[in-house]
């Protein structure tokens, strides 16, 4: 059986990257929440 996590840098960036987050309203909300919380890393 194949494991669920098959790492890929391209897929990681496309799905969870900064530009992917900024593309939708809810994604921008995630970025703002993480900024407000003071996260060192905002997204992948």
From Swiss-Prot:
Gene Ontology CC: one annotated term: ribosome
Organism encoding this protein: Neorickettsia sennetsu (strain ATCC VR-367 / Miyayama) (Ehrlichia sennetsu)
Entry keyword set: Ribonucleoprotein, Ribosomal protein
Family in the record: Belongs to the bacterial ribosomal protein bL34 family.
Single GO BP term: translation
GO MF entries: structural constituent of ribosome
Designated name of the protein: Large ribosomal subunit protein bL34
Superkingdom of source: Bacteria
One Pfam family linked to the record: Ribosomal_L34
